[in-house]
Each structure stands twice: as structure tokens, then as C-alpha cells.
A protein has these predicted regions:
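Gly/Ser/Thr-rich active-site loops/lids in small-molecule metabolic enzymes
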Residues: 170-215
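Redox-cofactor binding/interface segments in oxidoreductases and associated redox assembly factors
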Residues: 7, 68, 179
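Short glycine-rich anion-binding loops that position phosphate/pyrophosphate groups of nucleotides
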Residues: 11-12, 72-74, 97, 183-185
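Short, well-ordered beta-strand core segments
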Residues: 66, 89, 177-178
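Gly/Ser-rich helix-loop-strand patches that form or flank binding pockets
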Residues: 77, 81-95, 99
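ATP/NTP phosphate-donor binding region
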Residues: 1-65, 77, 105-122, 131-141
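Catalytic core of DAGKc-family lipid kinases
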Residues: 96-175
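Short glycine/serine/threonine-rich phosphate/pyrophosphate-binding segments
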Residues: 16, 73-78, 185-191
């Protein structure tokens, strides 16, 4: 049985937190303990939303689930926080893209099924990304979608040598390369001509960006 659900609405998508308030009402009606945490601060409305808003980091302890209200960007933002605590994320789509969301706004009533455990948790591969220079890690993070290496502001192609633990994979000359997880295969990688992977595939997609040649 769920002991605590965190409702995380994106205030730029859920104006006045209308959808989150309705979700809270539904969960309260089935006696599902819940708190509301806003992951993005809305500078235009700093005074609150008529709800008891709690600090997200403080409420993560003991949480059984995070419900994200927004688009894929909201889910991506929360996924890194959730992964460190092994907390599943349920997405309610309020954005223009909702590849990762399981529910649409019109399906909010189904949240009442959570206390009856009428749901399954699906594991998703994440990328552990590090930038190493001269043997020193200067950046490290988790990514649910993809990691991208590009030429940036340089107005010429770059040459990349891509290797795995087994050795050389391929060389790319072009604008860069995308390394996408199965979840990320429907995003930037797909737009760059990469294939779509099933979300449970144990592998990644390496997609060159505007390649001049593959060798």
C-alpha cells in the first residue's frame, strides 16, 4: 500500500495547479497520503496556489511514487531526482509532447486505482554521463533521454572516435553524435534519423548528426 505520493505539477503547464488540485482531491477520496511539491518556481506567482506546498528534497524520504504533471520535459527533470532514490515516476501529460506520460488529463480518475495497487512499475534504462579531461571527471550526471556531443559554436565539422569497452565502434565526421537510451530513441535521435527502440531494450542508439561520412 502506498504510504506517500508526491504530486509534482509544472506551474507553467498546470496554471493555478488546477489539475494537481483535482488529482489531490481524487487521492484524498481514496485515503492515499499525498503532498504537493512544485519542482519549478513560477516567478510570476511566488505567493503560492492555495495549497500547502512542501520542499521536494525534504519530501523524497519515504515517498513511494512521484506523479509529474506537465510534458516530457517535466518528467525528464524529475527522473534524475527520482532515480537517486529509486522512486517510480508516473507522468500525466499536460504538454504538447507526451511520449513518456502514462495518463492524459482526462484520465485523472484512474489515480484512484493506485491504493488498490492496480498498476505496474516499468524499469527504464538511464545513461550515466561523465566528461573526463586529463584523467579528471569535470562533469557527471544521469540522463533518461540522451547525451549529445556537438561542435557547438565552431563553424566546421568535428571528428569523433567512438569506442566501447570492446573496442572501436565507429568514427563520425559531422556536426556531432547522439547517444540515446531506449526512452530517448523517440526524441532527438529519432529526429536525426535514428531508429526507435522498445522501452525495455537493453541497449543504446548511437546516431550521427549531419554526418559527412561514416568510416
Amino acid at each position: 500500500m502506498l504510504k506517500k505520493v508526491i504530486l509534482c505539477p509544472n506551474p507553467y503547464r498546470d496554471h493555478e495547479l488546477t489539475v494537481a488540485k483535482e488529482a489531490k482531491r481524487i487521492l484524498d477520496s481514496v485515503h492515499c497520503p499525498n503532498v504537493v511539491c512544485v519542482p519549478f518556481r513560477n516567478e510570476e506567482k511566488p505567493e503560492g496556489y492555495g495549497l500547502d506546498i512542501r520542499p521536494l528534497q525534504q519530501e523524497l524520504r519515504g515517498a513511494d511514487m512521484i506523479i509529474a504533471f506537465g510534458g516530457d520535459g517535466t518528467i525528464l527533470h524529475l527522473s534524475k531526482t527520482a532515480a537517486h532514490r529509486d522512486i517510480p515516476v508516473l507522468g500525466v501529460n499536460l504538454g504538447s509532447l507526451g511520449f513518456m506520460a502514462e495518463l492524459e488529463q482526462k484520465e485523472l480518475g484512474r489515480l484512484g486505482e493506485l491504493m488498490d495497487e492496480k498498476y505496474t512499475v516499468e524499469s527504464r534504462m538511464m545513461l550515466d554521463v561523465s566528461v573526463v579531461r586529463e584523467g579528471r571527471v569535470i562533469y557527471s550526471n544521469l540522463a533518461l533521454n540522451e547525451a549529445v556531443v556537438t561542435r557547438g559554436a565552431v563553424s566546421r565539422v568535428i571528428r569523433l572516435h567512438i569506442r566501447t569497452e570492446q573496442g572501436r565502434l565507429l568514427d563520425v565526421t559531422g556536426d556531432g553524435v547522439i547517444v540515446a537510451s531506449p526512452t530517448g530513441s523517440t526524441a532527438y535521435s529519432l529526429a536525426a534519423g535514428g531508429p526507435i527502440l522498445d522501452s525495455q531494450t537493453k541497449g543504446v542508439v548511437v546516431t550521427p548528426i549531419c554526418p559527412h561520412s561514416l568510416a
